[in-house]
Amino acid sequence: MYTTGLIGKNINYSESPEIHNNYYKKNNIPFFYKIFNLNQDQIDYFIKNLHKNNIKGFNVTIPYKETILQYLNDIVYPADKIGAVNTVVVQEDKLIGYNTDYIGFIKSLQYYNIQVKNFKCLIIGSGGSAKCIYYALKELNAGDICIVSRNPEKARLKFEKKVKILNIKDENKLDRYDLIVNCTPIGGPNFREQKPVKLKEVKKNCVVYDLNYTPKRSKLLKEAKENGAFIINGEKMLIFQAYSAIGLWCLNGIKGGR
């Protein structure tokens, strides 16, 4: 039996163990998935003991999607371009990083039959998830993409120079966007009573996507729905990225072994 899991901080709310373990059981895959709640100073120890603990692969979530890069031997496209990794394959002599969030986000839009070509898009946040969504939207030929951040100067170091980056306090014309994506933990399980922005008005047929999936309807999504937007939470993205990660681990674990 191989171990897989999720590393992050304050992540006991995660639905990933249920998704993965149900899939493993249904498909007779000899894996088990668990939560690894780690402080940053515990990551070194976790990495050094991967083989000892029979860990074949793991997912990475907030706040370590960029931190994990320093531990990897190879980073596979598009994770190398994004600069953030959420899935790691553990081989005998190296760690390989992938970004299955990228795939999960694109597949979730396809699931809801949303075509973002030429959409004017707003990304809330500037961390690893935001970078992933930015490159996914570019891949899908979205139109103008604007990023709002609490720290725009720091955010500008992470994105292409041509990207429009604003202070989150300065962007109040949200009715100009066709798609708004919240890539912050605000509104999620650890910040349920907060919203990253106020949606007093949204464009007709605007899509508001909150990558948080707990609660099912964040305060942001509730407000968006009240204003006539089509709303999506991060559940489908979570499921699709999980299946992509499982595929990578199975290819490595069952066929490759170690």
Swiss-Prot record:
UniProt keyword Amino-acid biosynthesis, yes or no: yes
Coiled-coil blocks: none
Family of this protein: Belongs to the shikimate dehydrogenase family.
A cellular-component GO term for this protein: cytosol
GO molecular function, one term: shikimate 3-dehydrogenase (NADP+) activity
InterPro entries reported in the protein's UniProt record: Aminoacid_DH-like_N_sf, NAD(P)-bd_dom_sf, Shikimate_DH, Shikimate_DH-bd_N, Shikimate_DH_fam
Catalytic residue list: 65
Superkingdom of origin: Bacteria
Protein's name according to its UniProt entry: Shikimate dehydrogenase (NADP(+))
Subunit structure, as described in the record: Homodimer.
Positions bound to NADP(+): 125-129, 211, 234
Known pathway: Metabolic intermediate biosynthesis; chorismate biosynthesis; chorismate from D-erythrose 4-phosphate and phosphoenolpyruvate: step 4/7
PANTHER family noted in UniProt: BIFUNCTIONAL 3-DEHYDROQUINATE DEHYDRATASE_SHIKIMATE DEHYDROGENASE, CHLOROPLASTIC, SHIKIMATE DEHYDROGENASE
EC number: 1.1.1.25
Binding site for shikimate: 14-16, 61, 86, 101, 213
Protein purpose: Involved in the biosynthesis of the chorismate, which leads to the biosynthesis of aromatic amino acids. Catalyzes the reversible NADPH linked reduction of 3-dehydroshikimate (DHSA) to yield shikimate (SA).
GO biological process: amino acid biosynthetic process; aromatic amino acid family biosynthetic process; chorismate biosynthetic process; shikimate metabolic process
Annotated Pfam families: Shikimate_dh_N
Keywords, ordered alphabetically: Amino-acid biosynthesis, Aromatic amino acid biosynthesis, NADP, Oxidoreductase
Reactions mediated catalytically: shikimate + NADP(+) = 3-dehydroshikimate + NADPH + H(+)
